[in-house]
């Protein structure tokens, strides 16, 4: 009754209006699962391959019909007949069927859509929530949200190099209250921006994208919004950055060239100067997390940054690790970073995603479950965050339904868990010296 009988993919649109995949899996019993695949704008060069058609006459070359066909004509034939509950066997079968180190043959987007749909179908077959199916009886930790309320870099047209300015409501007693803190700060920020005559249009991840005078202007404005909403920076709410440094790192000159986003007159920093600058910001403001502070291939820079700041700030590898256990293992061995960003489409299966989270935790690294800038209404990452007791999630600002869908799912999960639910706030940063 739990045997897979049909697998079907179709092309749908993501939050940027670009094509992506939706996959459906059916079993003999009638159990059903559906998975939708996100897409990134700033992508690490070592990520698994997102298969696009390249036909410029259709969606500007971004169509996903090849990936859809790979699901319907190749993957479906290979996994029909499997027990839907055997997630690892199905994921391994798809990896073997692809046969490349980066899933470049079938496409990570094709494989991931099936992987998610299989898990959802199994949960439906067992008549339990997805987080319970994935995590078992010890599932209880609601994640501390990283809320991206200012968008810069590749996620907006604002002249700021850093891609994300985030708030983290660590002082809230529950996830529900943490979400309220964030929403109130978001609206306070909007009022401040309007009062200054700045734009309140939002970027890809739902944050504002105003023309600030620079990074520190953005930080000071966020701090003012936190206080205007009635909260205390550095107690109720901390700050975080996603620098996305690979987006403005000049490989030939080996410098961090802020002029790419901030224009003529902006800083051009060496690796050592980049570390000094980040330390300066950390010493000045209540910053608890920095993502991709160094370029993805600047291993010496990452190690130096970790040695300098790794005891007091969470240093998250996104493009640096690309949710890949090979890169994470090297980082652990060399003492580079102290946290990994978990993006399911960077690696391509739920099995490999869970392996990366487990490896990080065993090494004392934190794991931050994350969305992509091109999202859908699929809320699987909310269930993954709770299933793994990851303790942190990054899923955008307090606007756009593609972001709110994840927050609303976490509210449902917190309700369903009842008294068992834990919101750990600052304790989610377990590898820092408070």
UniProtKB/Swiss-Prot annotation:
Record-listed E.C. numbers: 4.2.1.11
Cofactor binding summary note: Binds a second Mg(2+) ion via substrate during catalysis.
Recorded metabolic or biological pathway in which this protein acts: Carbohydrate degradation; glycolysis; pyruvate from D-glyceraldehyde 3-phosphate: step 4/5
Subcellular compartments: Cytoplasm; Secreted; Cell surface; Secreted, Cell wall
Signal peptide: none
Pfam family, one: Enolase_C
The keyword Magnesium appears for this protein: yes
S-S bonds: none
Recorded GO MF terms: magnesium ion binding; phosphopyruvate hydratase activity
GO biological process, one term: glycolytic process
Residues involved in Mg(2+) binding: 242, 291, 318
Cellular component terms (Gene Ontology): cell surface; extracellular region; peptidoglycan-based cell wall; phosphopyruvate hydratase complex
UniProt-annotated binding residues for (2R)-2-phosphoglycerate: 163, 343, 372-373, 394
Cofactor(s) required, per the database record: Mg(2+)
InterPro entries recorded: Enolase, Enolase-like_C_sf, Enolase-like_N, Enolase_C, Enolase_CS, Enolase_N
Family under the similarity heading: Belongs to the enolase family.
Function description: Catalyzes the reversible conversion of 2-phosphoglycerate (2-PG) into phosphoenolpyruvate (PEP). It is essential for the degradation of carbohydrates via glycolysis.
Name of this protein: Enolase
Organism: Streptococcus pneumoniae serotype 2 (strain D39 / NCTC 7466)
């Amino acid at each position: 009754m739990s045997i897979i009988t049909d697998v079907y993919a179709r092309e749908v649109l993501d939050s940027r209006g670009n094509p992506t995949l939706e996959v459906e899996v059916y079993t003999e019993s009638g159990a059903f699962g559906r998975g939708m695949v996100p897409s990134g704008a700033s992508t690490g060069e070592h990520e698994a391959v997102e298969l696009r058609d390249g036909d410029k006459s259709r969606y500007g070359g971004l169509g996903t019909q090849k990936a859809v066909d790979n699901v319907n004509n190749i993957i479906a034939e290979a996994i029909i007949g499997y027990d839907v509950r055997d997630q690892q066997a199905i994921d391994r079968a798809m990896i073997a069927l692809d046969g490349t180190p980066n899933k470049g043959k079938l496409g990570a987007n094709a494989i991931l859509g099936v992987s998610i749909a299989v898990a959802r179908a199994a949960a439906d077959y067992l008549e339990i929530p997805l987080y319970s199916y994935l995590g078992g009886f010890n599932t209880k930790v609601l994640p501390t949200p990283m809320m991206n309320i200012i968008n810069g870099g590749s996620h907006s047209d604002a002249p700021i190099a850093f891609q994300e300015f985030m708030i983290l409501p660590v002082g809230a007693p529950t996830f529900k209250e943490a979400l309220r803190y964030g929403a109130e700060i978001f609206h306070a920020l909007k009022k401040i921006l309007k009062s200054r005559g700045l734009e309140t249009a939002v970027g890809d991840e739902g944050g504002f994208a105003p023309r600030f005078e620079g990074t520190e202007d953005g930080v000071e404005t966020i701090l003012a919004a936190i206080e205007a909403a009635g909260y205390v920076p550095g107690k109720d709410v901390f700050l975080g950055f996603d620098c996305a440094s690979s987006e403005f790192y000049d490989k030939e000159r080996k410098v961090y060239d802020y002029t790419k986003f901030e224009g003529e007159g902006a800083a051009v920093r060496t690796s050592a100067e980049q570390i000094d600058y980040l330390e300066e910001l950390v010493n000045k403001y209540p910053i608890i997390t920095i993502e991709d502070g160094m370029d993805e291939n600047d291993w010496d820079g990452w190690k130096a940054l970790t040695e300098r700041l790794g005891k007091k700030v969470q240093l998250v590898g996104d493009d640096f690790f690309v949710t890949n256990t090979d890169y994470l293992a090297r980082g652990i061995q060399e003492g580079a970073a102290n946290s990994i960003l978990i993006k399911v489409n960077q690696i391509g299966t739920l099995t490999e995603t869970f392996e990366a989270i487990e490896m990080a935790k065993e090494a004392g690294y934190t794991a931050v479950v994350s969305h992509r800038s091109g999202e859908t209404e699929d809320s699987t990452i909310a269930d993954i965050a709770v299933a793994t007791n990851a303790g942190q999630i990054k899923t955008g600002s307090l606007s756009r339904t593609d972001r709110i869908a994840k927050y609303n799912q976490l509210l449902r999960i917190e309700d369903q868990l009842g008294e068992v639910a834990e919101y750990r706030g600052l304790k989610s940063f377990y590898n820092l010296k408070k």
